[in-house]
């Protein structure tokens, strides 16, 4: 059984929605077991709620130590000024012990993201890759492997590096059908690669 983890941070629910679609796609691959988890929220709960954060998220909270249990990890990261959120950065900064043991070396990794008005979505994905490369993970982008990537009839997310969604400046825009289709493709593609590599 190939084990895939969809690991995310989501403040307003956009990445949570994308994570569910990523998982749907991964579950389409035979012999793959998919788990969705989130990183711990580091904001004070009262401040998080006051900022409009989505406090009800069904995914359990992950610990860095359990990353070794998976063959592939698909990271969901909101964009903050062209980088991952501090919550995801804090989580990954706790994986130094895993790095020292080479515990994630050779595991599959992929990244999807959200952003307000499009600024930094690609940079967020590629800057996240840097950390994953230090672990020796095998990074799987999505290229232009799905027809939705060529649909430019309206403004929306989607990059060859990974699925993205545009949340709008106030966060009111939710992932649309095209963005979710790209997310499902990413999940299926990564799970397929992971299953092939596991043999």
From Swiss-Prot:
Enzyme class: oxidoreductase
Cofactor: FMN
Domain Flavodoxin-like: residue ranges: 4-190
Record flagged with keyword DNA damage: no
Pfam families: FMN_red
Segments crossing the lipid bilayer: none
Note on cofactor: Binds 1 FMN per monomer.
The UniProt record lists the keyword ATP-binding: no
Residue positions binding NAD(+): 12
GO CC, any one term: membrane
UniProt superkingdom: Bacteria
Binding site for FMN: 10-15, 79-81, 134
Xref: InterPro entries: Flavodoxin/NO_synth, Flavoprotein-like_sf, Flavoprotein_WrbA-like, FMN_Rdtase-like_dom, NQO
Keywords per UniProt: Flavoprotein, FMN, NAD, NADP, Nucleotide-binding, Oxidoreductase
GO molecular function: flavin adenine dinucleotide binding; FMN binding; NAD binding; NADH:ubiquinone reductase (non-electrogenic) activity; NADP binding; NADPH dehydrogenase (quinone) activity
UniProt catalytic activity: a quinone + NADH + H(+) = a quinol + NAD(+); a quinone + NADPH + H(+) = a quinol + NADP(+)
UniProt: substrate binding residues: 99
Annotated EC: 1.6.5.2
NCBIfam families: flav_wrbA, PRK03767.1
Family statement drawn from the similarity comment of this UniProt entry: Belongs to the WrbA family.
Protein name: NAD(P)H dehydrogenase (quinone)
Originating species: Tolumonas auensis (strain DSM 9187 / NBRC 110442 / TA 4)
């Amino acid at each position: 059984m190939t084990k895939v983890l969809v690991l995310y941070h989501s403040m307003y629910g956009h990445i949570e929605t994308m994570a569910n679609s990523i998982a749907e796609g991964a579950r389409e691959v035979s012999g793959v077991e998919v788990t969705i988890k989130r990183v711990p929220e580091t904001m004070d709960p009262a401040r998080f709620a006051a900022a409009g954060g989505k406090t009800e998220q069904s995914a359990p909270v992950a610990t860095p130590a359990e990353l070794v249990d998976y063959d592939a990890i698909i990271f969901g990261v909101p964009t903050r000024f062209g980088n991952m959120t501090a919550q995801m950065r804090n989580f990954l900064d706790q994986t130094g012990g895993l790095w020292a043991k080479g515990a994630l070396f050779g595991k599959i990794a992929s990244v999807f993201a959200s952003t307000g008005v499009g600024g930094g979505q690609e940079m967020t994905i590629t800057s996240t890759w840097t950390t994953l490369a230090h672990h020796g993970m095998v990074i799987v982008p999505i290229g232009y492997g799905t027809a939705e990537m060529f649909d430019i009839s309206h403004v929306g997310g989607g990059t060859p590096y990974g699925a993205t969604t545009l949340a709008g400046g106030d966060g009111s825009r939710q992932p649309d059908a095209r963005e979710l289709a790209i997310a499902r493709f990413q999940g299926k593609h990564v799970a397929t690669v992971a299953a092939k590599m596991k043999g």
